[in-house]
């Protein structure tokens, strides 16, 4: 496993991390009891970055991840990242959310992120400075954001008084390359890292069948699953290198400087995912994958827009809807 630094001054993390959305999430049918085995296998494979959020299963994912890390005695050896929800309208509520996340985890996270931008009528700086307040309160060691388009990432970073945003966690994969148009170049200019969620397009780039609601309802999963050119390119490169299609898709992101955080409900798959960090793509491999996925640079729009609709939903309604659904 190789390790990279988040941002200019953030923690050193494994080139491939592990996402815990699937653990505790109703949309994935996740089982929190799997967290212990997932963390154990990940640590044995060199993975030290684990990502969760307060809305994943209404906190169940945080609780499961925290319990696993504590039971295995790994707190000082891993980087735990969590996200406070974008429905928190001010610094006071962001600090309150960070404290609640720390209680569920059983410790303060290493990296605290704002999961999505606040509603349009709330000053961006009020929310982002809440992350800085949480930092000063000892509720995290580093701060970042998630689902921020490039221009907003730049504005958010300018809001900070002393701290810096070490990362922007966005959806990024061979099936969704829109971040290359705005997020990636802006992050690079600021010295922030890209953490890539859904790096396998919810399993479509690994040849998965749609077994969960999160897959069946996702347009990008459907598009990538049916894209013969992209699937053939993945199979071709995988066969040449003697690895899996999933490892090729993750290696493509690592090669571009992103830190992918794939998720899984199967502990036996963790070593495969970790192995992607050691896959070496040739120039011909890169060209083939770039060409097969070129349509996905603009197919979903010319500006990153995940969760953009939430910017026009009042915080109270966001909170109530997520609670009623049992979390994300």
Predicted regions and their residues:
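N-terminal binding-site loop/beta-alpha segment at the start of enzyme catalytic domains
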Residues: 1-78, 316-317, 321-328
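Acidic (Asp/Glu)-rich catalytic clusters
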Residues: 7-10, 66-76, 99-107, 133-135, ...
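Short acidic capping loops at alpha-helix termini that bridge into adjacent secondary structure
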Residues: 14-15, 51, 75-78, 108-111, ...
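Acidic-and-aromatic substrate-binding clefts and catalytic sites of carbohydrate-active enzymes
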Residues: 26-29, 53-62, 87-92, 119-122, ...
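Short, acidic/polar
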Residues: 29-42, 90-105, 126, 151-154
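A short, structured active-site edge motif that brings together acidic residues
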Residues: 76-88, 111-115, 169-172
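Active-site groove signature of glycoside hydrolases
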Residues: 105-121
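Beta/alpha (TIM)-barrel catalytic core signal, keyed to glycine-rich beta->alpha loops juxtaposed to Asp/Glu
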Residues: 117-299, 305-328
């Amino acid at each position: 496993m190789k390790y990279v630094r988040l941002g200019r001054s953030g923690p050193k993390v494994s080139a491939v991390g592990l996402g815990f959305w699937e653990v505790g999430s109703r949309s994935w049918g996740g089982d929190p009891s799997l967290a212990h085995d997932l963390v154990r296998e990940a640590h044995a494979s060199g993975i030290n970055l684990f990502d969760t959020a307060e809305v994943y299963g209404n906190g169940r994912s945080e609780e499961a991840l925290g319990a696993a890390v504590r039971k295995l005695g790994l707190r000082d050896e891993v980087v735990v990242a969590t996200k406070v929800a974008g429905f928190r309208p001010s610094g006071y509520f962001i600090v309150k959310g960070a404290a609640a996340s720390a209680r569920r985890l059983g410790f303060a996270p290493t990296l605290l992120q704002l999961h999505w931008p606040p509603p349009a009528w709330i000053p961006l700086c009020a929310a982002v400075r809440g992350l800085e307040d949480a930092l000063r309160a000892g509720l995290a060691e580093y701060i970042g954001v998630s689902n921020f388009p490039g221009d907003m990432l730049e504005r958010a970073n300018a809001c900070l008084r002393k701290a810096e945003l070490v990362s922007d966690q966005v959806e990024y994969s061979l099936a969704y390359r829109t971040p290359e148009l705005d997020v990636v170049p802006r992050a690079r200019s600021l010295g922030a890292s890209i953490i890539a969620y859904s790096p396998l397009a919810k399993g479509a780039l690994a040849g998965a069948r749609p077994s969960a609601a999160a897959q069946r309802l996702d347009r990008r999963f459907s598009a990538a699953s049916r894209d013969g050119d992209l699937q053939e390119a993945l199979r071709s490169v995988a066969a040449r290198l003697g690895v899996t299609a999933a490892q090729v898709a993750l290696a493509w992101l690592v090669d571009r400087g992103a830190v992918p955080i794939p998720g899984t409900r199967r502990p036996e798959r963790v070593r495969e995912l970790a192995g992607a960090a050691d896959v070496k793509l040739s120039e011909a491999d890169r060209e083939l994958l770039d060409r097969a996925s070129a349509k996905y640079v603009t197919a979903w729009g010319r500006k990153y827009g995940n969760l953009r609709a939430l910017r026009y939903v009042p915080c109270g309604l966001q909170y109530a809807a997520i609670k009623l659904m049992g979390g994300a």
